[in-house]
Every structure is written in C-alpha cells, then in structure tokens.
C-alpha cells in the first residue's frame, strides 16, 4: 500500500488529470519554466520589479527535471499568487531566496515520482533537514516574543528553507484530498460554508484540529459533535470544544484503557478527571468551562438518541466549583498616563485605535472591524460612532468627542487612498480587518521598550478588554447611573454591568466633574440606533445633553446632580435679593418649559436626585410666573 492511499489521497489517475488541468490554467507567462519578475503580469510583480535594489529576478523551475513535480511546484506558486494569498514579494524575495535549495533537493531525491504526495511529509522533512545541515544551511531561526510576564524570550522556529517545503507538501495533501472538508482531521474554516456570524475575522484561528486523539472511535464521535455545534456556536468556540474533549478522551485512554465507548463511562472515571482538573492549578472559571463542555456532549448524546449514550447521569451541579465574583481588570490611571505619553512611538493606526478604545470602551473585535463611514454627525455638529457588536450580533452607536472624530476622519482619508477596495478603517494588506493579536502585540511591545510599569514597578501587560473595563469602572465610580453605563457599553443585561459597580476612596468631586464634562457634555451619552439611523432623534439628543443636568436660564449646569446638589444652580431663584418684572416673563416661561421637560425625563427614568432638584426649581418658577401674571 503506498503512502497516498493511507492518507486518503485521490488515485494516481485522478492526480494525473488534475496535473493536466494545472498545465491548462498556467498559460502565457506562467507556462514558462523560468519566471522573470520583469515580465510577470501580476500587479504586485510589476510594482516590485521597479525596485532598483531587487536582487532576485528569476525563479528557475527548470532545475527540477521531473516534469510532474515541476508542474506541481509551478502551480503551487501560481495558485497562491493569483488567489491573493501571496504577493510577488513573498514569491521572489521571501521564498525566492530559499527556493533553489528545495528545487535541487527534490530533483536529487525524487527524480521518478509522479506526485509529491507519494512521499510522506514526515519522511521528506527529515531528509530535507539532513540535506540542508550537510550543506551548512540553517534549519531553524530564532525569533523573539514578549511573554505573558512581559519578558523578551527567544523562540526557535523552522527556517524559511524548511517551511517552504512543508507548505508545498501540505498544499497538495489538501489539494488531492479524497473527500469533504468534514472528513479531514483538520478543518479549515476558509474551506467550509460557514455564515459570517460564525467567524470572527479579527482572529487568527483558521482551523479545528482533531489530530492527536489516542482513540479513533472517540475522535470520530467528537468530529460529529463539533459539526453539529457549528450550527449554533462560533468557530472559535467549537475549536475550544474539540481541544477540551480531546484532553478528556486522551486522559481516559491513558488512565482507563478499558473504556472504549461512552456508555461504559461511570462516575469513577468522571471523578478521576475532576481531580485531574483541580490539580492542574487552573482557575475555577476554566474548570467550569471544561466540565460544561463535557456535560454538553453527554446531554446532546442523550437528547438526540445517538447510538452510544451515557448509561446514567455522570455530571452533577455540585461538580462545578464556586466561581468568585469577577472584578473588572481596569487599567490604572498611573499606567494610562505612561501609555498616552508614548502614543507617538506607536504605528499611526495603532495609536488611533488606542485613542478610540480609551474613549468608547468597545470590545477588541469591534475596534478591529470599524468600517469606513462609521462616523455619524447630528444637526449640532456632534459626532457618534457606529459599529457592529460581534458578541451581541447587532449594531451599536455611542457619542464620541470631536477630537477622536477628527482622528477617525484623518484615518479614513488615508485608508481610502491606500486601500480603496477595503471596507475597513484598519485593514491588513489584503484588505481584511486587522487581527486582534496585532493590536495587543504592539501595545505590549511598547510597554517593554518604553518601560511602562505599574505602581509596583513591574512592566505592565496590556489586555485589550481591560480598556473596556476601565471605561465601565470609571463611569460607575464617578456616579454614572448603572443603566446608562449598560447602554454605553452595549451590555445585554444589568448583570454584565454590575461587575463594575465598586467605588474607590480616592474618587474626588473635581475628577468626577472632569469625567462627566468629557463624557456627558462634550461626548454626550449612549444612544441606541433607531430604525432610520437618525442621530437627531429627540430622545437621543436628550440623552446626549441632559442626563444628570440642571436647567439654567441660559443653558444647563455641567455639574451632575448625582455628585450632590450644586449650591450655585439657579441660586437667584432662592436669593432674597432677587427681583424680576413682566419684561422677563418670556425667559421665566421658557425656563419653566425646559425644566418640566427635564423633570418628565427624570421621573420616567426614576432619577430621584434630578427629580428633587428640578421640582424645587419648577415650584419657584411657578410662584414667580403666578405673581407676574396674577
């Protein structure tokens, strides 16, 4: 039995037909056995060929005399170039500098094969590493990454020489696969007909990996279950399900080899697994997640009456650990001041993203997928930011400052020029939205290089979601009503917001005033988009300008009533030296009308302090107007 039959590859005759089709596709320039970048019709090649410093002009496939293998090699690069996966720089520079060694190796080792899939990947990679080492070529490279402890650590990886061959061979393992994507042990979401809401485009998670199962039966069971879960769950969550179930069934295979089917499971095996989890030193919330995934599998098997189901209840409510109430992981002002003082050292787009997330507190996926045209402007010239909430599957609008709106406008102009075909405000080179890891990585690289530390002197580790916690915590600490914070952050339930409801002793009234002046007076407050996307909606404008306000004859008091009654607000109405006449009657009537409007809103929202303050103003105005008109 040859290697390809073991790996579920199509027959040799089918491979020959596919290779014939490849040759038909590669016409004109692509039919040549030597690719000259100066003659390549691909747009990225035309641009790159203008570079006077370009040293690698040719890719010479004629070094491989085996015609079958040569066609596969050419098509491998042709496919990646013409499907937008790679550009000319990748082919002629990044891979072009290492390709000759691979071509010579293939010509030497496999002169007679009719497809690269005749050779097992593991065998070819071992032989190639030996080949390179004997010729003094490095097979590994050292990269550096910032760890979770904010330490710079060297990481060994395969060199480009090695990865080039590995990518080539894996491409044809997939290209010649005999079956559907679901039949593979690695599911690539790019090859699955998944709806957009199942895939978060800001994550690098492209695959669900079922390799590594010690028991083939349990692997097939988990694959079937994961395919079912993809009907309702996100791709990333199903990937986690596959990993956790693999851990459980491998534990079972190592400790209880006699258990070969689900119906053979008892509490003995489950309790042993629970003990294993508790000895791993992981958080209670993580343990809860793993138990929940396992219970989800068992309950599904029972409800849907699969052939192999648990013979009894295996998991009970008391198996779940008690989870401590989570505290928001906010970023201390001490750290934020350092971050903001070094924004100029970040790439322009990362600095802009940092300013936006500090003000709006959106989730990282929402920040990365902001689109061109996300700014809305009302009749007063104030701005709102519209974005899509991946978690809640809905659009959301929050008011933003004119300063941040200007940054967004500048960014939009730049992106429209550089990436006219991309819909995103922060696109990658291929036009897709920026990945979350890029944003986190740049911030933590900055923290390491600029020595951004916490109060204990340790280099600070930035987590993107901490900006959201910071906005929520700051709003609650400064007296913002919880339901308003809930609206601003786009939380589905009050429970999601209540985690921010803790107060710090160092909160001062002047800081509170400064906070509200920014988020209420200048930025306004949160408003949900109505069906017509009208930011000039009356209720929206009331939220923007009047939450926690007191009416004055010529405007509104900017000191929130929730911070305590202001002794100066409408002081003339209570002053014994105050006097007025009929000539001021229109102003009094206008102020009364505005006060009544604000009072109605306050009563409707049950804002008791605002009701008390504005009721007093209303009574005094009615007395004055009554006297003037009586």
From Swiss-Prot:
**Gene Ontology MF terms:** DNA binding
One BP term from GO:
DNA recombination
Query: CDD domains, per this entry?
Result: INT_tnpB_C_Tn554 (cd01187)
InterPro entries, per this entry?
CB, DNA_brk_join_enz, Integrase-like_cat_sf, Integrase_catalytic, Integrase_recombinase_N, Tyrosine_recombinase_XerCD
Keyword list (alphabetical) reads:
DNA integration, DNA recombination, DNA-binding, Transposable element
Question: What residues form the catalytic site here?
Answer: 363, 391, 465, 468, 491, 500 (o-(3'-phospho-dna)-tyrosine intermediate)
Tell me where in this chain the Core-binding (CB) domain is found. 216-302
Q: Does the keyword DNA-binding apply?
A: yes
Domain named Tyr recombinase: which ranges? Answer: 326-513
Q: Which cysteines are joined by disulfide bonds?
A: none
Q: Does the keyword DNA-binding apply?
A: yes
Read off the Pfam families from this record: Phage_integrase
Q: Out of the domains of life, which is the source?
A: Bacteria
Similarity remark: Belongs to the 'phage' integrase family.
Q: What does this protein do?
A: One of three proteins encoded by transposon Tn554 required for its transposition.
Protein name (Swiss-Prot/TrEMBL): Transposase B from transposon Tn554
Source species of the chain: Staphylococcus aureus (strain Mu50 / ATCC 700699)
Q: What is the lineage of its organism?
A: Bacteria, Bacillati, Bacillota, Bacilli, Bacillales
């Amino acid at each position: 039995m040859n290697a390809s039959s073991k790996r579920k590859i199509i027959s040799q005759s089918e491979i020959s037909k596919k290779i014939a089709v490849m040759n038909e596709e590669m016409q004109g320039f692509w039919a040549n056995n030597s690719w000259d970048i100066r003659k390549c019709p691909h747009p990225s090649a035309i641009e790159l060929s203008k570079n006077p410093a370009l040293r690698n002009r040719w890719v010479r496939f004629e070094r491989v005399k085996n015609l079958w293998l040569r066609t596969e090699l050419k098509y491998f690069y042709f496919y990646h170039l013409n499907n937008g996966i790679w550009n000319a720089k990748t082919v002629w520079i990044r891979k072009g500098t290492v390709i000759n060694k691979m071509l010579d190796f293939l010509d030497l080792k496999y002169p007679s094969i009719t497809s690269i899939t005749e050779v097992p990947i593991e065998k070819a990679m071992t032989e190639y590493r030996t080949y390179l080492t004997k010729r003094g070529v490095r097979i590994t490279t050292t990269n550096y990454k910032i760890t979770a402890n904010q330490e710079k650590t060297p990481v060994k990886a395969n060199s480009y020489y090695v990865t080039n061959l590995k990518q080539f061979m894996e491409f044809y393992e997939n290209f010649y696969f005999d079956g559907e994507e679901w039949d593979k042990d690695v599911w690539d979401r790019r090859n699955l007909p998944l709806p957009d809401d199942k895939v978060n485009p800001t994550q690098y998670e492209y695959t669900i990996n079922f390799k590594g199962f010690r028991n083939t039966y349990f692997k097939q069971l988990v694959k079937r279950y994961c395919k079912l879960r993809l009907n309702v769950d996100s791709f990333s969550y199903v990937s986690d399900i596959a990993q956790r179930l693999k851990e459980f069934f491998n534990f079972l295979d190592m400790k209880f080899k006699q258990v070969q089917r689900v119906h053979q499971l008892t509490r003995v095996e489950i309790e042993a697994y629970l003990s294993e989890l508790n000895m791993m030193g992981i958080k209670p919330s993580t343990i809860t997640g793993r138990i929940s995934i396992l219970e989800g599998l068992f309950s599904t098997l029972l409800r849907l009456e699969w052939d192999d189901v648990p013979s009894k209840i295996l998991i009970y409510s008391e198996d779940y650990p008690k989870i401590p109430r989570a505290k928001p992981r906010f970023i201390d002002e001490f750290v934020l001041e350092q971050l903001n003082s070094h924004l100029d050292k970040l790439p322009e787009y990362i600095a802009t993203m940092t300013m936006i997330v500090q003000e709006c507190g959106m989730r990282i996926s929402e920040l990365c997928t902001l689109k061109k045209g996300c700014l809305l402007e009302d009749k007063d010239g104030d701005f709102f930011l519209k974005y899509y909430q991946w978690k809640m599957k809905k659009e959301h609008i929050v008011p933003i400052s004119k300063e941040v709106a200007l940054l967004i406008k500048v960014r939009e102009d730049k992106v429209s020029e550089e990436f006219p075909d991309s819909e995103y405000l922060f696109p990658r080179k291929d036009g897709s939205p920026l990945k979350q890891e890029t944003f986190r990585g740049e911030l933590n690289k900055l923290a390491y290089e600029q020595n951004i530390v916490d109060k204990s002197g340790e280099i600070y580790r930035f987590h993107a979601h901490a900006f959201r916690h910071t906005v929520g915590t700051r709003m609650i600490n400064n007296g913002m009503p919880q339901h308003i914070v809930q609206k601003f952050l786009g939380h589905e339930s009050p429970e999601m917001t209540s985690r921010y409801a803790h107060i710090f002793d160092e909160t001062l009234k002047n800081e509170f005033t400064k906070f509200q002046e920014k988020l209420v007076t200048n930025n306004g407050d949160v408003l949900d988009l109505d069906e017509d996307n009208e930011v000039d909606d009356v209720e929206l404008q009331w939220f923007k300008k009047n939450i926690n306000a007191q009416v004055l004859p010529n405007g509104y008091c900017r000191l929130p009533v929730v911070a305590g009654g202001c002794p100066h607000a409408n002081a003339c109405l209570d002053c014994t030296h105050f006097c007025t006449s009929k000539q001021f009657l229109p102003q009094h009537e206008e102020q009364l009308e505005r006060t009544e409007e604000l009072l109605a809103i306050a009563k409707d929202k049950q804002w008791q302090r605002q009701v008390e303050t504005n009721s007093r103003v209303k009574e005094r105005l009615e007395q004055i107007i009554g006297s003037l008109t009586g």
